[in-house]
Amino acid sequence: MSVTPKTLDMGAILADTSNRVVVCCGAGGVGKTTTAAALALRAAEYGRTVVVLTIDPAKRLAQALGINDLGNTPQRVPLAPEVPGELHAMMLDMRRTFDEMVMQYSGPERAQSILDNQFYQTVATSLAGTQEYMAMEKLGQLLSQDRWDLIVVDTPPSRNALDFLDAPKRLGSFMDSRLWRLLLAPGRGIGRLITGVMGLAMKALSTVLGSQMLADAAAFVQSLDATFGGFREKADRTYALLKRRGTQFVVVSAAEPDALREASFFVDRLSQESMPLAGLVFNRTHPMLCALPIERAIDAAETLDAETTDSDATSLAAAVLRIHAERGQTAKREIRLLSRFTGANPTVPVVGVPSLPFDVSDLEALRALADQLTTVGNDAGRAAGR
């Protein structure tokens, strides 16, 4: 039996000043970054002081915001004088954020030792989960400034939408691992390290990495471990903040099976972690543009094709009818996909966002997307063509 989902009222969520963090999450390539920017713009138009933290945005999105070069610090987006709020935007610079953490939690001498370490410069920021960990760290920094009354977060692109929640723990697990503890062995030089219990393994690593790189890795681990308690404590504190009232997770999904499957996983995980879920943005849908049934459109097109009169008007009418029928088939497929999601998640509110016929390349286009996201009557069934 088909379940009609509740409508996600994003306008009310953005206008509610008790909400301080909105996290846009979901699989890669579903429109999270553009959605985050549109929500941030709308919140500023509601009178709020907003910063949107983006992850690797397309160049045209930066241009849409009126900023040529997004950086690791918030930059104010120029808005019309009548807009009562403020919008600031920034892009996560993973390396600079890592550098800031090292300097914050280490003394000057130790911090410089870490920053100059060759292993840190070439490998550290490539560790699995580092980007998500740094996104969490940057969110914590923004929250601690108490400068913004709303922070909108675009989570890192990933093949697995759960990485944003799992990465801080995974990076922590790596730093608790046997290899990490081996490199950390107190009072040992690299020569003694290689002749210890794990000598064969370390020799193999030395062959692959080179002895100097292995020495740099050991020095990096030993320097960083003294400060990692601060890293872990900060990440745990930020993670806890995401569970508090005032945070809203918005799961974004395209109208595709894999993206909706990821969305379902994320909804389940948020429930398990007791994290506040606002609802689902069902993005880039193709609703029917008129009430003409698909079968009648096909019949009418075939009738026109059969006419002996071969005019441009007849050919154009037949082509329009076929386009309508094709769009109708797409809409039916999207409705089936949404029905599966709502059947498995009947309590999750949904807003449907039709695919725009233009690129989001300026503030007006971003505002048009914000209109779709915050229009209360824009329920998922209508947006998907139901």
Curated annotation (Swiss-Prot):
Pfam family for this entry, one: ArsA_ATPase
Traits of the deletion mutant: Deletion of both bagA and bagB does not reveal any conspicuous growth defects in vitro. The double mutant is fully virulent in the tuberculosis mouse model. The double deletion mutant is not hypersusceptible to arsenite in culture medium, but it is significantly more susceptible to nitric oxide (NO) and it exhibits a glycerol-dependent recovery defect following mouse infection. The double mutant is hypersusceptible to extracellular methylglyoxal, suggesting that the glycerol-dependent toxicity is due to heightened sensitivity to methylglyoxal generation.
GO MF assignments: ATP binding; ATP hydrolysis activity
E.C. number(s) listed in UniProt: 3.6.1.-
ATP-binding recorded as keyword: yes
InterPro entries registered for this protein in UniProt: Anion-transp_ATPase-like_dom, ATPase_ArsA/GET3, P-loop_NTPase
Keyword Nucleus appears in the UniProt entry: no
Keywords on record: ATP-binding, Hydrolase, Nucleotide-binding
Binding site for ATP: 29-34, 283, 354, 356, 359-360
Regulation: The ATPase activity of the BagAB complex is not stimulated by antimonite, an arsenite substitute, suggesting that BagAB is not a transporter for this family of elements.
Comment on protein domains: Binds nucleotides asymmetrically. The two ATPase domains of BagAB are spatially separated by the large central cavity and they do not physically interact with each other.
Subunit text: Forms a heterodimer composed of BagA and BagB. Interacts with Rv1509.
Function text: Component of the heterodimeric BagAB ATPase complex, whose two subunits are actively involved in ATP hydrolysis. The ATPase activity is required to mediate resistance against nitric oxide (NO) and elevated levels of glycerol.
Family: Belongs to the arsA ATPase family. BagA/BagB subfamily.
Protein name (record): ATPase BagB
Organism: Mycobacterium tuberculosis (strain ATCC 25618 / H37Rv)
Lineage: Bacteria, Bacillati, Actinomycetota, Actinomycetes, Mycobacteriales
